[in-house]
């Protein structure tokens, strides 16, 4: 290290000698030393600060002569560094932090045994650590002369700190909280045994804890003189509180709820044994509990004089309620449902043994249950006079229904399907032993089942006069069908496939013993099988 100044001095003398020989004025010795020192500092800054990380860090740092408040055993401990070396490490974080730190002469409110305990640091060292967090926090803290409402045994208990030290810890959270707290003279509605029980605090201390949550809540609470509809044994039972204390707890939820509640003089349709049974409450107490849900629900309910289509043994059976009580329960769901229901005089196509069987209900009661699903379905159904193509043994077999009853069940699916079906006079290419075999149906009945899939398929099929390249023993073998019947099955897949196939006059590169060997087919018959899939495949490309 002692050699460096000597080398620097020797370099300076050499520069002076060279300048004298060339006849140029010699540079100032002071300027040369300053330049050398700035370069050394810049190099040191790059080593310490990571070099080019910040533009401002290239100037001589005012931090370099600052002593930390304390020392950290582990220099990778962010919390300790945050407290002890705040002037050093965090000094460059903000432009304003370059002025002398106001933190240095601040004493903490209390002391923490563990300097990495964020909750304790938040309370005791709030002025020190969090002081630079906000611009406004640079003024003398209003927290210093504030006494907490009560004391906490555990200073890391967030719920207790939230209640007792609310003015201290959360005081700086909002600008408005700097005025004298309106909470200090408020008495709770009741007392909680467990101060961390959020449900109890929500009910009893609502004016105290939640008072600052909304601007409007600063006025005298309208809850204080409200009596609940009934009493709950368990004050943490949300369903019971929702029903009995609705005016008390949920009263401040909406602005409109501040007017006298229209629920108070409403009698339920029926009674529920279990007040936590949501389905029963939905049906019997709909006018009471769900009455405030929508603005329109404040008018007299149109449900009150409606008789259900049938009766359900189990009032919590959603499927049965959906069918029998549709006018009652789902009546308020849509605005249009307030008119007399068109379902009432409709007879089902057939009868279902199991009223929860969605497939059967979809087919037999389509006009009844699904009638209100779409606006267009209110006209007389075109399904009623349509005979199926064939009959299914299992009415829940979707594949069979898709083929045989296509005109009946799927007829209303698309607007275009209301015209006479072009399928009715079409003969299949071949027959399938298993009507649920999708591959066979795809090949033999392609014109029948898939004919309605695309608009273009309504023209005469170009497949009908095409002979396959070869024959497959197994008509469900997709690989064989892909090769032999490519022109037939895949012909309709793309618009371009309607032109004469370029495959027909193409000879394979080689032969495969096993026509289901995908690797061999991929190499030898690439021009045949993949020719239509990718136009870039050609003999030149294959070499």
From Swiss-Prot:
InterPro entries: Endothelin, Endothelin_toxin_CS, Endothln-like_toxin. GO terms for cellular component: extracellular space. It is found in: Secreted. Residues 1-23 form the signal peptide. Residues 51-530 are annotated as: 12 X 40 AA tandem repeats. Sequence repeats lie at residues 51-90, 91-130, 131-170, 171-210, 211-250, 251-290, 291-330, 331-370, 371-410, 411-450, 451-490, 491-530. Keywords: Cardiotoxin, Disulfide bond, G-protein coupled receptor impairing toxin, Repeat, Secreted, Signal, Toxin, Vasoactive, Vasoconstrictor. Expressed by the venom gland. Disulfide bonds join 70-84, 72-80, 110-124, 112-120, 150-164, 152-160, 190-204, 192-200, 230-244, 232-240, 270-284, 272-280, 310-324, 312-320, 350-364, 352-360, 390-404, 392-400, 430-444, 432-440, 470-484, 472-480, 510-524, 512-520. The record marks 90, 130, 170, 210, 250, 290, 330, 370, 410, 450, 490, 530 as: Endothelin-receptor binding site. Residues 45-65 are annotated as: Disordered. One of its GO terms (biological process) is vein smooth muscle contraction. Residues 24-69, 92-109, 132-149, 172-189, 212-229, 252-269, 292-309, 332-349, 372-389, 412-429, 452-469, 492-509, 532-543 form a propeptide. GO terms for molecular function: endothelin B receptor binding; hormone activity; toxin activity. Vasoconstrictor activity. These toxins cause cardiac arrest probably as a result of coronary vasospasm. Belongs to the endothelin/sarafotoxin family. This is Sarafotoxin. It comes from Atractaspis engaddensis.
